[in-house]
Amino acid sequence: MLDVIVIGMGAHGSAGLFHLAKKGLNVLGLEQFDQIHNNGSYHGLSRIIRMGLYEGDAYLPLAKRSFELWRELEKEYNEQILYMTGIINIGNKNSPIYKNTLNSAIKHNLEYTEMNNQEIMSKFPGFELPNDLNGVFLKEGGFLDPEKAVKAHTQLAIKNEAMINYNEKVLSWDDKISHIEVLT
């Protein structure tokens, strides 16, 4: 009997499968497509990651923990997945995104630099900005390699005795009180 079935081996599913297997649970991952496919949302070269969050303070502990988990994954997988390049949020100084990013950086002692449009265009020559835009550059930000992350999570999940069935579409599931039946 399985402890957990994880449906979908994309970014979230593969990470969940890995962490459950690492805790010693008997887990199965189900993916309706091949291991390599272009049907998910994790494909491409990069996904943004940042510590200064304009969405609100409640997310900061999650962001801090995610940085720790990415570094742990890199160490265990022995490849770089997280690239710390810094990140800039650009907007009008009165915009909620700009103000919230700046307030988050100040409140949580994050390393940041406020920049006007000329400073931004000098540092990042690819930008051509109107005069009313400014930026908050945060050192604690960058990008992830999402495809490598999924590969690392699935390979390490298997190393921790998880099972993964590819090309197995879930048709339905039914709660039987004592267990859940999954029909594929």
Model-derived features: positions:
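Beta1/beta-strand and adjacent pyrophosphate-binding region of the FAD-binding site
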Residues: 1-12, 28
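Gly/Ala-rich phosphate-binding loop of Rossmann-like dinucleotide-binding domains
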Residues: 17, 21-22, 156
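Glycine-rich FAD pyrophosphate-binding loop
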Residues: 21-42
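Helix C-cap/helix->beta junction micro-motif
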Residues: 23-25, 77, 108, 160
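Short, flexible, mixed-charge acidic loops at enzyme active sites
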Residues: 39-46, 127
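Dinucleotide-binding Rossmann-like beta1-alpha1 core, especially the glycine-rich loop
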Residues: 46-123
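Flavin (FAD/FMN) cofactor-binding and adjacent substrate-gating region
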Residues: 92-160, 165-166, 172-178
